[in-house]
Every structure is written in structure tokens, then in C-alpha cells.
Curated annotation (Swiss-Prot):
Keywords: Hydrolase. It comes from Vibrio parahaemolyticus serotype O3:K6 (strain RIMD 2210633). Homotetramer. It comes from the Bacteria. The keyword Cytoplasm does not apply. This is Glutaminase.
């Protein structure tokens, strides 16, 4: 069965009672102010059709979803061995901002989707690009077809002000020799990437290359190779949802990436990209109602990579 607006609307009605059972991220003050009753879903098919329900055109802070975009950009700039010499490809089994594992593993982060790994990717981008922040913004605007996407400067400043733990992660990696640039500019770029403001429709369009062998459905142009697409989807399936990746694979069965802003993107290779948003999070930091919505969609349309 193909997704329809009616199916999406029904799913949102079914998950709405979950609102109130999760917790909006409050360690970033600007995120704590987001109304907890927001709920959205958007599907972008490989034929270029948008199907949506709820607050699907409203922008929100994508947070860690941006880590998949930064890694994609790094894969366009570096040979794969240059990236994987500095960051691993394994699930962490620890909190996304853990210092303990990083210390034990000599400053090499487990994967590019935990904070330490994404900070290494930001360092890689800083080494190759004269203006990495602007380049990432242009990249996202191009892939989404939305020239109005911006960084939320209030969120970025809020993250920088409350980002001591991320600074500790960066300095710890530098002490192990796994850092090339000055820490503060790299962190500023990292925080800005997390502060990208996008809607579910924007996100579904932006990530369409992951469902289409590396070619953006929105632009018709290649972003990465089919092999790199397979690699990105594999990492998303195993590491994309913090310490809840196994649970997500079990329930939803699609490669995905979440953010503490309450967004999740999910990929059905060869068919479609999906984005959901509900700000309340579960214990792993993933959208509570958003995960349930994806689980229901997977069941209704009979799609899973497993």
C-alpha cells in the first residue's frame, strides 16, 4: 500500500494521546520553549510527490539530524579511509555525549552520529572548507529546494553557552591527537549545524538522495555514489538513534536519524523518505510520538528493510 494523506492523518490522530508522556529537551533553554503539542509527518516519494499531515510545513530545530548531512558533505570531500581513520562505524551503547568511552578508546569516537563523532566530522569540514557553515547551509537549501532555510541563531548561541560538555569532548579528542583545528570555531560550526531550522517537508526532500541511490529527487543531481548511499543508510540503521537504534530497527525497520528537537527522518530505499516531528522525547532522546508514528506507518504500508 502507498502512503496517502488520509493514512498520515489517521496515524497522527492515533499517536496524539502519547503527547504528555515524554519530555521536551530542556538542557538547551531555547528548545525547552517549543510547544509540546506539535505533531507532523511528511513523505517525499521517489516520484517527487509530497504527502503530509499535521504541522508538516512548520520549521523546528533539527539538532542531530544535521549530523547525517555533515557526514554526507564530508564524504563528498574526503576519501573514505581519511574519515574512518578518525571515527568508527559501530553503535556506542552509551549516552550520545559520553566522555567515558572516548577516554577508553583513545579519542576515537564510536560513530559519526554521537556528539564526539559529529564534532570530528565538523573538524574535517573545517580543514577542507573556507566557510563550512555557509557551505552546509547552501547544501541544505539546494537539496530541499527551500532557499529560506536558516540557522536559528538563538538556539546556536544557547547551545554554545551550555556546551561545556561538548567542549570537553573536543579537548579530550585533541589531547589524543584526533583534532586538527582550533576547538572553538569547530564547535561554533557544529552548534550552528544543530541549529538548522527545517520543516518535515524540507527534511523529507533534503534526504531524498538516500532513497534514490545517491541522486536527489528534488534536484535530479547526484549527491553521493550508490555505494556511499548504502554506507550512509547502514550507519543510520545501526547508529542513527542514539542508544535506541536497536529498538527503532525492531519497531520501525528503516534507516533513520533523530534529533533532540523531536524530529526523525527515515528512509525506504528505492521508494521514499519520511520525516516526523513531535518535541517530546523518550528516555533515549528520540521523539516518543514520532517513533510510534513511523512504526504505525511501517505497518500500514508494509515497508521495512528487514
Amino acid at each position: 500500500m502507498k502512503p496517502t494523506a488520509e493514512i498520515l492523518t489517521d496515524i497522527l490522530a492515533e499517536v496524539r494521546p502519547l503527547i504528555g508522556q515524554g519530555k521536551v529537551a530542556d538542557y538547551i533553554p531555547a528548545l525547552a520553549k517549543v510547544p509540546n503539542n506539535k505533531l507532523a509527518i511528511a513523505v517525499y516519494t521517489n516520484e517527487g510527490e509530497v504527502i503530509k499531515a499535521g504541522d508538516a510545513d512548520e520549521s523546528f530545530s533539527i539538532q542531530s539530524i544535521s549530523k547525517a548531512l555533515s557526514l554526507t558533505l564530508a564524504m563528498c570531500l574526503y576519501k573514505q579511509e581519511e574519515i574512518w581513520a578518525r571515527v568508527g562505524k559501530e553503535p556506542s551503547g552509551q549516552a550520545f555525549n559520553s566522555l567515558i568511552q572516548l577516554e577508553m578508546e583513545q579519542g576515537i569516537p564510536r560513530n559519526p552520529f554521537i556528539n564526539a563523532g559529529a564534532i570530528v566530522v565538523a573538524d574535517l569540514l573545517q580543514s577542507r572548507l573556507s566557510a563550512p557553515r555557509q557551505r552546509l547551509l547552501e547544501f541544505v537549501r539546494q537539496l530541499s529546494g527551500d532557499t529560506h532555510i536558516v540557522y536559528d541563531k538563538v538556539v546556536a548561541a544557547s547551545e554554545m553557552m551550555h556546551g561545556d560538555r561538548n567542549a570537553a569532548i573536543a579537548y579530550l579528542m585533541r589531547s589524543f591527537g584526533n583534532f586538527e583545528n582550533e576547538v572553538i570555531p569547530v564547535l561554533q560550526n557544529y552548534f550552528h549545524a544543530c541549529a538548522l531550522k527545517m520543516s518535515c517537508v524540507d527534511l523529507a526532500k533534503t534526504f531524498s538522495y538516500l532513497a534514490n541511490k545517491g541522486t536527489s529527487v528534488q534536484t535530479g543531481k547526484p549527491v553521493v555514489s550508490p555505494t556511499q548511499t548504502k554506507q550512509l543508510n547502514a550507519l543510520l540503521a545501526t547508529c542513527g538513534l542514539y542508544d535506541g537504534a536497536g529498538e527503532f530497527a525492531y519497531r520501525v525497520g528503516m534507516p533513520g536519524k533523530s534529533g533532540v528537537g523531536g524530529g526523525i527522518i527515515a528512509v525506504v530505499p528505492g521508494e521514499m523518505t519520511i520525516a516526523v516531528w513531535s518535541p517530546e522525547l523518550d528516555a533515549s532522546g528520540n521523539s516518543l510520538a514520532g517513533t510510534k508514528a513511523l512504526e504505525l506507518l511501517s505497518e500500514r504500508i508494509g515497508r521495512s528493510i528487514f
